[in-house]
């Protein structure tokens, strides 16, 4: 991997939405690190993080992008900015798809419109592998694969709609450089509590941590199988910094090797795989969701079963990007941190924080 020159980052003002979350925290670590050439970092969040690294050197602006009142905050947030990285995305409450759509899709539209109105030269939008249509398990897909998503997934539908909103706005403003980032599953140990609460809920998350034997030795995984990749949040942040430095445009897949099937996942975690028919797993998840035992709607399983693995050649070639962390190591470290209840001090990454 070529070293990042950072020549074009010198003196830039960079605005980051969703700056206190999983990816936002990783990006702030880079942009505010000693020796960073970035002149100013602005962060947008619903709640102000504590005044500790990496949040303490950020100029914070507070608003909820799902509310029209945010339209009065965004102009000041984006005034004089050289680039905005839009990371803000709500995963909960999963039982309120209307609320999620307002925050995620309409909020994205608000940010991009405000960026164009403020004359921001570069807009980077964080998307996801979930925008891709179902693909073959035997090959990785490039950025030209159809972006129609997995229809049964609320998350996937909103990601597709958010990308469409970005295209709709920037398509009328060719003077603005637009970048769309489509990573595979993004993990880091510091986000273990955040992700555990999002997908297991506080009750099952706490129970899973107290029952390590049951939690760590048997792993029901679907038949016929899965093909899943993982990438460390720090490696995604590295790619984002390279996009800012080079003002790279267009879509970029981000994934680390290896792509893992069900057996590889079980081996990595030291578990015993229990092959389970996919319809049975989905029915169990649907029942648990209906009974309010978990906050995870069944569409998440559909993404895991159907979303294709990603080819990151474009990022490697145009950005000289290569992840420093192997995907299997990222998964193993994350699950270990999940068992320890590991977190960071931000309002989203801290297990005592609200959603």
Where are these predicted regions, by residue range?
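N-terminal Rossmann NAD(P)H-binding glycine-rich loop of SDR-like oxidoreductase domains
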Residues: 9-37
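N-terminal Rossmann-fold cofactor-binding loop
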Residues: 43-48
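NAD(P)H-binding glycine-rich loop region in Rossmannoid oxidoreductase-like domains
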Residues: 63-106, 114, 134
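Glycine-rich NAD(P)-binding loop of the Rossmann-fold in SDR/ketoreductase-type enzymes
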Residues: 99-110, 157-158, 231
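Conserved Rossmann-fold NAD(P)-dependent oxidoreductase catalytic core, especially the SDR/UDP-sugar
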Residues: 106, 110-155
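Active-site Tyr-X1-5-Lys
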Residues: 152-179
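NAD(P)-dependent short-chain dehydrogenase/reductase
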Residues: 172, 176-228
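Mid/C-terminal beta-alpha module of Rossmann-like enzyme folds, strongest
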Residues: 227, 235-298, 312, 328, ...
